[in-house]
Amino acid sequence: MSIMDIVNNKADAYFYIEKQLPDDVRDAGRRCVKAFDVKSRFIHFEFFRLNKDMPGVANKGEIIALEVNMRPSGGFTPDMLNYANSTNVYKIWADMIAFDRCTLSEYADKFYCIYVGRRDCNPHKNAHNEILSRYRANITMSD
């Protein structure tokens, strides 16, 4: 489901942080950094992997860029990146500006992290409080 579908259909939203970026996504990101000559900026890119051929655009399985943003991701995404990678993305950004390198140690612990945004207008099998009472030990943040 696309962001446009979520907005237009008032659908619930979800996404997750991968433990490891696929090589083609990492390569596309690095090519974007080079193409835009980005230095010491907090950036984020948004790519989609096509689930069907789109003649004139790309083939099924290939990635296409949606956005190149010269700012941090929105919402809870920076917190999710921190948790999933046992890191601090804002400290990394500050280090790039101040020292032109990262001073944080690389941590081995990596986790999956998922965001789920439920709309009040949609029916749900379980109420928010029921989910919290059942899974609180596995939920890092809830709003």
Predicted feature descriptions by range:
Residues 1-3, 65, 136-141:
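A structural signal for short, hydrophobic beta-strand segments that form beta-sheets
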Residues 1-38, 42, 58-60, 69-97, ...:
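ATP-dependent carboxylate/phosphate-activation module, predominantly the ATP-grasp catalytic core
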Residues 39-52:
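A short glycine-rich, hydrophobically flanked beta-strand micro-motif that places a catalytic Asp/Glu
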Residues 44-46, 65-68:
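Short, conserved beta-strand edge motifs with alternating hydrophobic and charged residues
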Residues 54-64:
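Conserved protein kinase catalytic/activation segment
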Residues 55, 76, 124-126:
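Short acidic, gly/pro-rich beta-turn/loop elements at beta-sheet edges
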Residues 92-143:
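Peripheral (often C-terminal) accessory segments that flank ATP-dependent C-N-forming ligase machineries
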